[in-house]
């Protein structure tokens, strides 16, 4: 269970009593509480059942004044020096030793809570070109160019790092191995992985496994624009079979569940378009693998193993899930949107693949803009937009506890963590219930009933059952027992264990 988090967002809001706001050191603080005296911070994240914290870029970036970090904000996708921790997150940015030590202390603190640390890496481009260390070392060599000699821009950031060239490839591999070994990292997330070449990443994976056999590797299997790197060489979704040790974000899952991230008002399966997307849901619940009993083309199923799929409905990019629901469901009540949010979360945690969420998603995180709308990409928005509002842990406790319960259910039942396409095809069966509603049968042990519409759904499992999740609660221990048919409320699930 991956929890995506920006270092500064974690502790910058004054709703929690952090001492080292916006710093690596905030992760080392214990007994942090919000304005209602509820536990927040690292202890809280561990209590959710998170297994890995994915940190947005923590290497040295270019656009933040390290001696005056509050003068600006950036996610960190503006690389300067890849192998040095960002100084603005330390108590003394002018002391190189402090950068290293304080980042190591963060990682140690996370490990002490039983979680791993995944580092977001951005090898696909550098913030500047002519002034970058690579251009000064060997002009032209480290960057891709178009046929007319201009810099290519598949990153949409001004340049592309030529990973396929021998010394560029070696730099990436050496950098990853250094970071994994020196900082005891547990994984890497690759920004715009489709701009990196397959050979480099496979070489890196082989060497990284020697350092940490359980290391997690995943990324964005696409580009940000046209690139001269031939498609057959790109580390992208269509080439996933050539990258067996890497998982990739499933934009099919993301957009299928809630609607396109590029069309704010477009609805997905959970918020208004269920009947048209029920076959898509069968596919993504199965981990995106090809199934003859699901109406989806084999060419659209880009992997044959759930271990290559990262399922999510919210990340740092684009609108938060709850903001998307506000825009795409303008006539719905606040409680209806909360129900839809919980339904989307259930699909993330109870589908085959790797579940991923953005920090604060479980407390209905929102990024309102001053003009009354919502910020799509808050990469340079102020702390007032980006910070986690820790009082929401208390205000939205029921939603948070629902997420926590779903995570616990996933951990208890191996049916939600199948490892091969054969197991998925043989153990998951789908039953169409009309209007896009589905029942997912996991052998004769579990039934997951999904009701994405606005009316109550009656379902009879044919046997007595123990209910683990309904519209209000989710838990790894049975909530109650039923005999005969049960009612599944609008925009919700029922998870039943059969007796």
Model-based region annotation:
Residues 42-47, 107, 176-180, 205, ...:
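Non-transmembrane alpha-helical segments in soluble domains
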Residues 8-183, 197, 201-212, 216:
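Substrate-binding/active-site clefts of carbohydrate-active enzymes
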Residues 3, 53, 117-119, 188, ...:
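Hydrophobic faces of well-ordered beta-strands that scaffold small-molecule active sites
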Residues 205-206, 210-370, 379-381, 428, ...:
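Conserved alpha/beta catalytic core and glycan-binding cleft of carbohydrate-active enzymes
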Residues 11-12, 61-65, 124-129, 195-199, ...:
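Flexible loop/turn segments at secondary-structure boundaries
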Residues 1-3, 8, 335-338, 349, ...:
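Carbohydrate-interacting/catalytic domains
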Residues 187-193:
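Short catalytic-loop micro-motif centered on adjacent basic/acidic residues
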Residues 15-34, 324-335, 378-384:
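A solvent-exposed, charged loop/short amphipathic helix patch at secondary-structure junctions
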């Amino acid at each position: 269970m991956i929890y995506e988090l920006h270092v500064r967002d974690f502790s910058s809001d004054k709703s929690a009593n952090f001492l080292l706001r916006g710093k690596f050191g905030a992760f080392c603080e214990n007994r942090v509480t919000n304005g209602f005296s509820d536990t927040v911070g690292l202890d809280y994240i561990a209590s959710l059942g998170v297994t890995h914290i994915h940190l947005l870029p923590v290497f040295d970036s270019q656009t933040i004044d390290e001696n005056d970090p509050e003068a600006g904000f950036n996610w960190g996708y503006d690389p300067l020096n890849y192998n040095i921790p960002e100084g603005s997150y330390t108590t003394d940015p002018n002391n190189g030793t402090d950068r290293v030590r304080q980042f190591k202390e963060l990682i140690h603190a996370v490990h002490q809570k039983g979680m791993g640390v995944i580092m977001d890496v951005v090898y696909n481009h550098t913030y500047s070109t002519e002034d970058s260390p690579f251009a000064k070392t060997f002009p032209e060599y480290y960057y891709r160019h178009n046929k007319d000699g201009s810099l290519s821009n598949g990153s949409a950031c001004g340049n592309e790092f030529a990973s396929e060239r021998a010394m560029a490839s070696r730099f990436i591999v050496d950098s990853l191995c250094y970071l994994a070994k020196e900082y005891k990292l547990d994984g890497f997330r690759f920004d715009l992985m489709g701009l990196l070449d397959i050979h480099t990443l496979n070489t890196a994976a082989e060497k990284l496994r020697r350092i940490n056999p359980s290391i997690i590797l995943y990324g964005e299997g696409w580009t940000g624009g046209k690139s001269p790197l031939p498609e057959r060489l790109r580390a992208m979704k269509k080439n996933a079979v050539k990258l067996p040790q890497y998982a990739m974000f499933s934009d099919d899952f993301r957009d299928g569940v809630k609607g396109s991230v590029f069309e704010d008002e477009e609805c997905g399966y959970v918020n208004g378009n269920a009947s048209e997307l029920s076959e898509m849901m069968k596919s993504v619940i199965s981990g995106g693998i090809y199934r003859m009993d699901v109406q989806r083309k084999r060419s659209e199923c880009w992997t044959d193993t759930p271990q290559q799929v990262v399922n999510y409905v919210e990340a740092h990019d684009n609108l938060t899930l709850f903001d998307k629901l506000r825009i795409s469901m303008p006539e719905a009540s606040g409680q209806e949107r909360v129900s839809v949010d919980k339904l989307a979360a259930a699909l993330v945690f109870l589908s085959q693949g790797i579940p991923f969420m953005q920090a604060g998603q479980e407390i209905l995180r929102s990024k309102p803009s001053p003009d009354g709308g919502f910020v799509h990409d808050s990469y340079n928005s102020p702390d007032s937009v980006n910070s986690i509002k820790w009082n929401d842990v208390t205000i939205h406790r029921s939603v948070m506890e629902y997420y926590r319960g779903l995570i616990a259910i996933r951990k208890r039942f191996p049916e939600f963590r199948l490892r091969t396409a054969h197991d998925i095809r043989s153990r998951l069966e789908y039953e169409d219930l009309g209007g896009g509603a589905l029942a997912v049968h996991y052998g004769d042990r579990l039934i997951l009933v999904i009701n994405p519409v606005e009316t109550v759904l009656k379902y009879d499992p044919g046997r007595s059952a123990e209910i683990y999740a309904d519209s209000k609660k989710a838990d790894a221990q049975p909530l109650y027992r039923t005999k005969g048919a049960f009612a599944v409320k609008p925009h919700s699930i029922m998870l039943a264990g059969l007796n």
